[in-house]
A protein has these predicted regions:
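Core catalytic alpha/beta fold that binds nucleotide/phospho-ligands
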Residues: 1-120
Length: 120
């Protein structure tokens, strides 16, 4: 069985939130591993918006599948392989029914979007 999640985010919204709440926003939404990448590479709002959209899309796919009743954004890590391709890691949560979890992220200076496929 396959489930999908999709999300679109206005980059300006994430930029405003990041400027207002900086560390509080990062700590509420992103895992320690993701925050370290943000700080190391000094990533901007476009990057954060893509990661945020991917988390939201992942959450939608997981919730629609019924294998979880709730999941926090911090539990959904959006990381990158060495070649830059994004992937989803559930930050230590083991869901035995998950066969595959794919994510695609795209963005412009105005919008970021993500599409997730969850296979059970």
């Amino acid at each position: 069985m396959m489930y999908i999640g999709n999300d679109i985010v206005e980059v300006s919204r994430i930029h405003r939130i990041f400027k207002m709440y900086h560390d509080h926003f990062l700590n509420k939404v992103f895992s320690e591993k993701e925050i370290n990448v943000v700080k190391q590479k000094n990533k901007d709002a476009v990057y954060l918006s893509g990661k945020f959209a991917a988390k939201e899309a992942s959450k939608k796919a997981l919730l629609s599948s019924g294998i979880v009743e709730n999941i926090s954004f911090k539990s959904i890590q959006v990381l990158n392989h060495k070649n830059g391709a994004p992937y989803i890691d559930l930050n230590g949560i083991i869901l035995k029914d998950v066969k595959d979890f794919k994510v695609s992220i795209s963005h412009t200076n105005t919008y970021a979007t993500a599409f997730v496929i969850l296979e059970l």
